[in-house]
Amino acid sequence: MQAGRQLFLVDCWLGVLQRASAGPTHTPAVCQRCCSTHLHGDRISDLGDLLITHWVTTFALDPPPLPIIGSPDTAETVEAKLKASGHDIEYQITHHTYLNTPPLIEVYEYTKGFVGAPPDGVSIRGSTNHGPVTPTIGFRIESGPTSVVLTGGTVPCASLDELAAEADALVHTIIRKNIVIRVHQQADQGHLQPPLVNRASDSNRGARGHRHPGHNVLCP
């Protein structure tokens, strides 16, 4: 999402780079911040691809580091992704004359509090509840009078209410039991479902579920 002149990527789902390439910017290199709500595999499936592609397509001799904001253990995960791409990094440096060093990444780990200052406008005001994964965090991105909350997966909790209070929109993952019927016993453990979305915050004005492409649910 874009806030002012800043472009944020929240979670690295499968296919996120293809979606970014199809957008108006056509490249993930313009992403100024990568925000990670938690370390479930589906949230970081394309993280390694993002690290390499962002690095290669910046086309600069001295590119700034890519900031990644996430929960504890994010730095370890990023390091593992880079290690897995070690041979490719060597190949890319050999092939591209403008690449002199491996990808530069700065990882910031938080569970609550304010992160950055204008024009960044990113705040983490508390953890969310997506057990058994812990900790998980939500992001509130603000630009001028507009604020959008992106929380990943969670169930209603006090910190989510606080994070989403008076926000213009809540972007949130939900699970639909009719789609994942074979694992329905697990569907209500750590995830919202469509009838419960609006319980996340009485003050939020919109929530969009994006867990299953083509099956989005919009709850006013």
UniProtKB/Swiss-Prot annotation:
Residues the record marks as active site: 42
Cofactor(s) the protein needs: Zn(2+)
Alphabetically ordered keywords of this record: Endonuclease, Hydrolase, Metal-binding, Nuclease, tRNA processing, Zinc
Domain of life of the organism encoding this protein: Bacteria
Residues that hold Zn(2+) 2 according to the record: 42, 215
CC cofactor note: Binds 2 Zn(2+) ions.
Residues at which Zn(2+) 1 binds: 38, 40, 130
Keyword Nucleotidyltransferase on entry: no
Uppermost EC category: hydrolase
UniProt-annotated stretches for the region Disordered: 193-220
Catalytic activity, EC: 3.1.26.11
Molecular function GO terms recorded: 3'-tRNA processing endoribonuclease activity; metal ion binding
Pfam families recorded: Lactamase_B_2
Chain coiled-coil ranges: none
Catalysed transformations (reactions): Endonucleolytic cleavage of RNA, removing extra 3' nucleotides from tRNA precursor, generating 3' termini of tRNAs. A 3'-hydroxy group is left at the tRNA terminus and a 5'-phosphoryl group is left at the trailer molecule
Family assignment from sequence similarity: Belongs to the RNase Z family.
Role: Zinc phosphodiesterase, which displays some tRNA 3'-processing endonuclease activity. Probably involved in tRNA maturation, by removing a 3'-trailer from precursor tRNA.
Subunit comment: Homodimer.
This protein's name: Putative ribonuclease Z
Species of provenance: Mycobacterium leprae (strain TN)
UniProt gene name: rnz
